[in-house]
Design a protein with these regions (language model features):
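Short active-site segment of divalent metal-dependent hydrolases/proteases
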Residues: 126, 130-131
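An acidic/histidine-cluster motif and surrounding catalytic segment
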Residues: 1-121, 132-167
Length: 167
């Protein structure tokens, strides 16, 4: 059973409920991963998502990555591969980790890509969730695998391929 804990601060439009979008994006990413059972096994699985401003993300990016500027999404995995494979529903709750999105960066990127903030935020949650599941883009092969999984997850959400050039 997947639990997605969402905290959206004042930087994010409070008139929009981000809960459903974030949850669906995380579920889609898990479904397209090597660990789809995490969303359906009955085992308690949790992801925390913080929707915040650029300043907080800049500070976290500086502290944890040594980069003194905001980025669109940060992911902090907490589970190892052996934890992800565990299917016993009696196993302790699995904390996959934290995903943090920066409002200003997300908004600027969405505008540049000519997509809605909601679609871009969903893409970043998918991307962040895949990082929590051990995927990365350090090599071309890994990046290609991650991109395919992102595109398939976004298709589940009815969101166009963000890597495809507009005609």
């Amino acid at each position: 059973m997947l639990e997605v804990a969402i905290d959206a601060d004042g930087e994010w439009d409070s008139s929009r409920s981000w809960d459903g979008l974030v949850r669906r994006a995380a579920e889609a990413a898990i479904a397209e991963s090597a660990f789809p059972q995490l969303a359906t096994s009955g085992r308690a699985v949790e992801i925390s998502v913080l929707l915040t401003g650029d300043a907080e993300v800049r500070d976290l990016n500086a502290e944890y990555r040594g980069k003194h500027q905001p980025t669109n999404v940060l992911s902090f995995p907490m589970a190892g591969p052996e934890d992800l494979r565990e299917t016993n529903i009696a196993a302790p709750e699995l904390l996959l980790g934290d995903i943090i999105l920066a409002r200003g960066v997300c908004e600027a990127e969405a505008r540049d890509k000519d997509v809605s903030l909601e679609d871009h935020a969903a893409h970043l949650v998918v991307h962040g969730t895949l990082h929590l599941l051990g995927y990365d883009h350090h090599s071309e092969e890994d990046a290609a695998d991650m991109e395919v999984r992102e595109v398939r997850a976004l298709q589940r959400l009815g969101i166009a391929n963000p890597y495809e050039e507009a005609a």
